[in-house]
Amino acid sequence: MAEWKIYTPEGVQDILQNECFFKKNLEDRIRKVFRASGYYEVETPIVEFYDVFSTEENIIPQETMFKFFDQQGRILVLRPDLTIPIARVAATKLKDAAYPLRISYIGNAFKYNELGGGKQKEFTQAGVEIIGVNTPEADAEVIATAIDAVKATGLENFQIDIGQVEFFKGLMEETGLSEEETEKMRVLIDRKDFLGIEELVEEHNIRDDLKELILDFPKLFGSTDVIDRVEKYPINERSIKALNNLRSIINILDDYGLSKYVSVDLGMVQSLNYYSGTIFRGFTYGVGFPILSGGRYDRLVEKFGKSSPATGFSMGINMVMMALDRQKVEFEKPRVDTLVCYREEGRKTAFQICETLRKQGLAVEVDINGGDFETARNYAALKGIGGILKVLDDENIEIHNLEKGEVSKVTISELLKA
């Protein structure tokens, strides 16, 4: 159908000059944060085997993936996530590297009905992974790096909510709920469905103090006082260990000087089959979805043949861009500093001037409209170029300051000295 050739499919889009400049600038800022903290960037293929993302835990539902076949009939996918391919690389090509591994990435992923961002099917993720260490220091470093990355984007009003999935799992052990009922409880708590939680609790013979704690679960968020409050209950060793781990991480973040960005949310219980300890999400106003998420996933790398603990986070670049736009955060826009025009006899000189100015860090365009100055002037005004250098001959130049409406003449040597 020929009429579709001028459109893009639903969920993908062209990114035009200003927005693309903005996006690449954002990625560069984030990349500098990662590199400054010792993370080395890797790239994994956009196309992967379906088996890489197919797990018994159904971490990424198969119906959300873009699937197709290769020439041998094997199922391929456009990667729906970047963390899982990093785990594959760590367990195979980097299995003999010095541990802990600090890996970073920035790349596009593809998924049907991606949460947030207008249901985009193509989106950009940036993140880091620490592989090979299971310590509170590693988890705290990942969270600190996430905070530094958000700050580098220009966002100032944001919050990182931190939870611990082992705390929930420990409580569920005490209740005697089946796996199916535990999953049902997880969903109810994640949705903060108080009525549903109460109904499920009343269906079982759960001791009163534990029942009280479970009913309070969706409200267990805020400052570190939440941990103090929960520790007063007679909880089991697994839950106590989880709370101690969480407190250690928060204390380390306090030493980083990042406490003001951090809050506790013990009701954060999504993806129990994926996360194995710390879990966190980042929020800012103007966007109804997390701008980043992460946590500890000690069982993922093992899927690819090497048992190794891991922790990391992923930031949604598109979500951050949306937040910056809605919060009216000013960002640098692409611009050309100077347009150089010339007559034929001054062409070589004009090119030499361009080269010199570019080495000085200026963005310089050469007029290619055929030498008509008025055409060049109108083009520069329309594009927002501040000035025009008109090369008259091998020695003399006219400087047209379009912002002030001023014209002056200088020699080439005078210009280059300035």
UniProtKB/Swiss-Prot annotation:
InterPro entries hit by this protein: aa-tRNA-synth_II (IPR006195), aa-tRNA-synth_II/BPL/LPL (IPR045864), Anticodon-bd_dom_sf (IPR036621), HisRS-like_core (IPR041715), HisRS/HisZ (IPR004516), HisZ (IPR004517)
Pathway field: Amino-acid biosynthesis; L-histidine biosynthesis; L-histidine from 5-phospho-alpha-D-ribose 1-diphosphate: step 1/9
Record SUPFAM superfamilies: Class II aaRS ABD-related, Class II aaRS and biotin synthetases
Gene Ontology MF: a single term: transferase activity
Any one GO cellular component localisation term in the record: cytoplasm
PROSITE patterns linked to this entry: AA_TRNA_LIGASE_II (PS50862)
Compartments it resides in: Cytoplasm
Entry superkingdom: Bacteria
Pfam families hit by this protein: tRNA-synt_His
Keyword annotations from UniProtKB, A to Z: Amino-acid biosynthesis, Cytoplasm, Histidine biosynthesis
GO biological process: histidyl-tRNA aminoacylation; L-histidine biosynthetic process
Subunit text: Heteromultimer composed of HisG and HisZ subunits.
Family: Belongs to the class-II aminoacyl-tRNA synthetase family. HisZ subfamily.
Other notes: This function is generally fulfilled by the C-terminal part of HisG, which is missing in some bacteria such as this one.
Function recorded in the entry: Required for the first step of histidine biosynthesis. May allow the feedback regulation of ATP phosphoribosyltransferase activity by histidine.
Protein name (database record): ATP phosphoribosyltransferase regulatory subunit
Organism expressing this protein natively: Acetivibrio thermocellus (strain ATCC 27405 / DSM 1237 / JCM 9322 / NBRC 103400 / NCIMB 10682 / NRRL B-4536 / VPI 7372)
